[in-house]
Design a protein with these regions (language model features):
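Short acidic/glycine-rich beta-turn/loop cap or linker motifs at sensory/regulatory domain boundaries
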Residues: 46, 82-83
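ABC ATPase nucleotide-binding domains
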Residues: 1-69
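Short glycine- and Lys/Arg-enriched binding-loop motifs that mark or flank ligand-binding interfaces
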Residues: 17, 30, 43, 68, ...
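Residues located in well-ordered beta-strands
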Residues: 54, 66, 78-80, 139-141
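Elongated periplasmic alpha-helical coiled-coil
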Residues: 70-73, 80
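Non-catalytic connector elements of ABC transporters
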Residues: 74, 84-191
Length: 191
């Protein structure tokens, strides 16, 4: 089936399952299919369940680095937890010149303070002006752009060599958008 027909069929199958009132288990490697059809998703690796939850929970709050990398596209930053409170944490990453600030705490007692911060490309903005915040941004240059119709995927290289993927909706036919070799800032919110 072509993509358009496959998507329509997925929605029809979900409607039939709901009308009949049965529980179905479906095994797929197609992430879009799983996110479209399921109200609960289980992510497995090496025969073990890594995480079970709604598609929104799996995508927005992955329980592990493996789940974050497996579902969708993600930018990962390894770093050290330098502050951990009930309402926030800060992570310093050698890939970034500024700390990452997250508006909820991890509250771990682990001795190893190393961790990963995962940022989805669509959660990142690409301003040309330097953000005023002391956290959650980095300067870089547009290294490459993939135009994908409804959105463009920007690859921004930072001074440390880190490549950060940023997704921008193509809401205007033509606009004043960054292009190759432009100096830009990548910026994201606290959560």
């Amino acid at each position: 089936l072509d993509k358009k027909l496959r998507t329509e069929m997925q929605l029809e199958v979900v409607e039939i399952i709901e009308q009949v009132g049965v529980t179905c288990i479906m095994v797929t490697h197609d992430q879009e299919e799983a996110m479209t059809m399921a109200d609960r998703v289980a992510i497995m690796a090496d025969g073990w369940i890594e995480q079970v939850g709604s598609p929104v929970d799996i995508y927005e709050s992955p329980a592990s680095r493996m789940v974050a990398e497996f579902v969708g596209t993600v930018n990962l930053f390894e770093g050290e937890i330098i502050e951990d409170a009930a309402d926030h944490c800060r992570i310093e990453s050698p890939a970034l010149s500024r700390p990452i600030y997250i508006d909820h705490g991890i509250t771990t007692q682990a001795v190893d303070r190393r961790g990963w911060a995962a940022l989805r490309p669509e959660k990142i903005w690409l301003p040309r002006e330097q953000p005023s915040s002391e956290y959650n941004w980095e300067a870089g240059k547009v290294d490459d752009i993939a135009y994908l119709g409804g959105y463009s995927l920007y690859y921004v290289r930072t001074a440390s060599g880190q490549m950060i993927k940023v997704s921008m909706a193509n809401t205007e036919r033509r606009g004043d958008r960054p292009t190759w070799e432009d100096s830009v800032y990548v910026y994201w919110e606290n959560h």
